[in-house]
Amino acid sequence: MKILVVSDSHGESADIIKLKEKYANETVAMIHCGDSELDNGDPALESYIYVRGNCDYDARFPNEVVTNIAGYRFFITHGHLYNVRMTLQSLSYKAEEEGAQIILFGHTHHVGSELGDDGVLYVNPGSILLPRGRKDRTYAILEIEDHTIHVQIHDHAGNLMKNLSASYQMR
């Protein structure tokens, strides 16, 4: 099973529409981790699970979402309310509180993934519009196979970035 994860599109709806069309038949879920800068109900966000980022001014967006997908409990947030620029510790506490096994977040515009000592998988898909730390605009595909999660990072054109992708054995 595959899950599309995108973040920080900052008003650029064409990219998230293109990704939605590309992956609609391949994924069980599509997630936007905030800072879409679109209105709640915008057609570009249709089919996405989405949260509010620090640049989203529509108060109807949820700050966070907890949901079960493909047998895993996900906690989805933008990250600005959890100080993710400095540490993942607050997210770790929230994961424990929510019983989450996978945390998806954005905000930093830095792409990355890691399996914490707490057994929680942390994934930041980077920014589809304004990357930091590298020039590549990115998004993630999570491919779930039993107890293995493959975090596949793709550039804006859809090319797999093997050096940023990783597989994690979940407990």
Feature map (PLM): residue ranges:
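Core catalytic region of metal-dependent phosphoesterases/phosphodiesterases
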Residues: 2-70
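Active-site-proximal beta-strand elements of phosphoester/diester hydrolases
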Residues: 2-8, 73-80, 121-126
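Active-site metal-binding loops of divalent metal-dependent hydrolases
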Residues: 7-10, 34-36, 54-56, 79-81, ...
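A short, polar/proline- and glycine-enriched secondary-structure boundary/capping micro-motif
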Residues: 15-16, 85-89, 134, 159-168
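Conserved beta-sheet core of the metallophosphoesterase superfamily
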Residues: 49, 84-147
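Helix-adjacent hinge/juxtasegments
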Residues: 51-54, 60-103
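Residue-level detector of beta-strand face positions
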Residues: 66-68, 113, 141, 152
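Charged phosphate-binding loop/patch that engages nucleotide di/tri-phosphates or the phosphate backbone
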Residues: 145-171
